[in-house]
Amino acid sequence: MCSSDLFFTNSNVLFYIAAYLVGSIPFGLLLAKQFAGVNVQEAGSKSIGATNVLRVVKQTNPSLAKKLGIATVLLDAIKGVVVLLIAMSMGMSQETLWAIAVLAVLGHCYSAYLGFEGGKGVATGLGVFLVLIPMPALIGAAVWGFCAKVLKVSSVSSLIGLVAVVIAAIFMNDGVGVDSNAPMYIITFIIFYKHIPNIVRLIKGEESKVV
């Protein structure tokens, strides 16, 4: 049986669908609506991610904003991890695990429940990286934390942290454990692509800080 046959077994396809659908759950949107009564898709950057949840809710309830922001980060990261861990427990190949990771990030960024709108993919990407390439992911998280504290610009900090993950994975692990680094690059590309509006605002000097 060729590798493509193994890649597209019935059980694998079910995992791929589950990864995308679970990744599509818009936790930031749901939390902000439930606990703050606001629709983050209609305010701020209109993203469903933690940064926009924090920014929008902070306007009326700063203490709640921090709690919802943290909860959004954690839930967005966890939703990328859940299907991965189940697949790992069943002995799925690294190629299959990376496909699941890519689809989880795609689900967050292009949610099936929101007309294929979504967030920027940072927390979900970090979640899957922590499972598949933990040390590079931890380095990237540390770089992100440092940059966030110094620069106070979420988008820039996230992208710098993401680049740190990629560089660390290449040098520490000699890649991601499969024949190609393509899955890691695809996730990186998706996240960068979703940040294009932020990059444009940054160039114009209009990107907001999150303090």
What are these regions (language model features)?
Residues M1-S3:
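Short, small-residue-biased leader/transition segments that mark boundaries at the very start
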Residues L31-K66, V200-V211:
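Cytosolic, membrane-interface loops and tails of multi-pass inner-membrane proteins
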Residues V38-A50, Y113-L126, V153-G161:
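Short, non-helical or kinked segments that cap or interrupt transmembrane helices
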Residues L54-N61, A87-M90, G107, G121-L151, ...:
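Interfacial segments of multi-pass membrane proteins
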Residues L138, S154-L162, G175-I187:
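Loop-to-transmembrane alpha-helix initiation sites
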Residues T60, L68-L74, I78-A112, W144-G145, ...:
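Nucleotide and nucleotide-moiety/phosphate-recognizing core
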Residues Y20-S24, V105-G115, C147-S154:
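Transmembrane alpha-helix interface/packing and boundary motifs in multi-pass membrane proteins
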Residues N10-A36:
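N-terminal signal-anchor transmembrane alpha helix
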